[in-house]
Amino acid sequence: MAGAALIGTPAGHLFAGIPAAPTELYALSSLLLEQWAAGLLSLQVTDSSRVDDYGGIWCPADKAVHGRSGDAIYPFFHLAAKTKNKKYTDAALLLYRWMDRRVSQPDGSWLNEPQKGSWQGTTVFSAISLAETLKNHGALMDPSFKEELRVRLKAAGDFIYNNFTIEYGNINYPISASYGLLLLGEVLDVPKFKVKGRALAHDALRFISTKDGFITGEGDPYHQPSKKGCFSVDLGYNVEESLPELTMYGLLAGDEEVLQAVTRSLRTHMEFMLPDGGWDNSWGTRNYKWTYWGSRTSDGCQTAYALLAARDPAFYKVALQNTRLLQQGTKEGLLTGGPHALSHGIPTCVHHTFSHSKALTTILDHGDSLRKPVPASLPREKSYGARFFSDIQTWLLSKGDYRATVTGYDREYKKFRNGHASGGALTMLWHPKTGPLLVASMNEYQLFEAGNMQADKDPHSMPLTPRIEWKTGGLLYMNISDLDATIEVEDSPDQLAVHTRSRLVDKDQKNPPAGEINCRVSYLFTKEKCVLSFQYDPIDAGQQEGQPGIIFPLISATGEPVEFVDDRSLKMVKAGSQLMLSADQPLVQLPTSGGRIFNFVPGLEAIPLYIRQNKAVLEIKVHSI
């Protein structure tokens, strides 16, 4: 490339960070990273006449270049070191020049999107990515570019140092700044950066809850509990960003106090990994960016769980299972937006790929910390009955092969309403032969972060969560919106029974014009089946608009054979097994645009079923064909 400021590996340079991939996790990560890089390279804009986009990575979904696409520079350099192929360094330089033109700011920050007034907090992620590049692959840069990068990183460090406090944005930002400042301080030899990085890391420890071990602070108010005593917790951001950055801080600083706190918290969050590697963030405050494999724009869980695998053998399995799932979700070199995104014809946002490529690059650069993994099980692989997490008012249920989640979590994200489900909702029903059967989405799909989410243009779109609802007077009333709902669990050797009480309320917790409508929803789990019972107060809707009903979206990808046996039962073939659904009331299939509805949260399709009566019992069984 004309004017390139990057050079090949110098004579005698030894890049010791790339391991020989002795374990499946590292072999798979290396393979997947190359696939993702190929996908990203194919989308890089090399037409210099496209001035604004030249050098950036084009997003097929958003028809634009995302402001954080420069995060791919770090993976490109890693692959340049591994393969000795100059195409990666050429692409990295071109991408850096795009960053410099389009998102770099005079105050040292980088914009989240190439738009005036865009969020600057993501500067910390760009700074970490470029500092890792300089630290691990500086030998691939010629002196002039290396010095240019050092100067630019110093400006970014000053921005972070001067602006970030423990209450800057959501908690993932100051936690990331703890590692970012320490790393910049080490790479650039700026002692004050390291001092503030340590202060932020230790201040962040008080955000790890004493009861359950969750990281709180994903939304405000930081310090004021909800009515049920809950604080703001988001599984996706915790496992894919905050805990990885605290891990990196602890390892670089040799800070055992931080590493012990992180280890405890990782064990708590590990409870929510499904056996297939999916993250059950059906309840999180920021689950508007939840995809089944993680979160749309965060980095990935591999950094924390792989690099601390020596502390708990199950950590290695967490990282491995999730990486396997990432591979399954990768098509044509890009990580798709959920298991059913492609089957529903959803274009792939490139953000998933360049963000998650950083986690794989990080563990590959650090080398395999666990050469001989000890066999271990994930918590949800075991049939343990019921576990309650009071921090989030959520139950995890495990009976036979069924895995379920029921939540009454009452902390919403900032001032937004109708985000994650509550009300005693069944937010996850999973079976090893079929994967997810019932899954919660947002109560109302809203673009809380429009630049980081995809618009839903389907006129038949709806929430995926099983629920009771009533549309009347231009408002939507649902039991899954009720933040005051109660949940009781009965755990016996033969069965698990969950009884919930809630009301039909709108997003502001108000009753419909007809008055208070009480709902009673129960879930029964045995080794053989799952039974769901719905009931709500009968009302005289004659003077009201619309009719209440029970809505039951059954997760099913386009192409899965479905047969209605009669008006009260159906059978479906999923992954070589058969699901039988039966009800004591007629089932009505609601309109769709092509046989299925799709929800970006968490990237799944479903067949929407409706029951008009105010009482219904549904039974689900799964068996091999």
Region roles according to the model:
Residues M1-G17:
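N-terminal export signals
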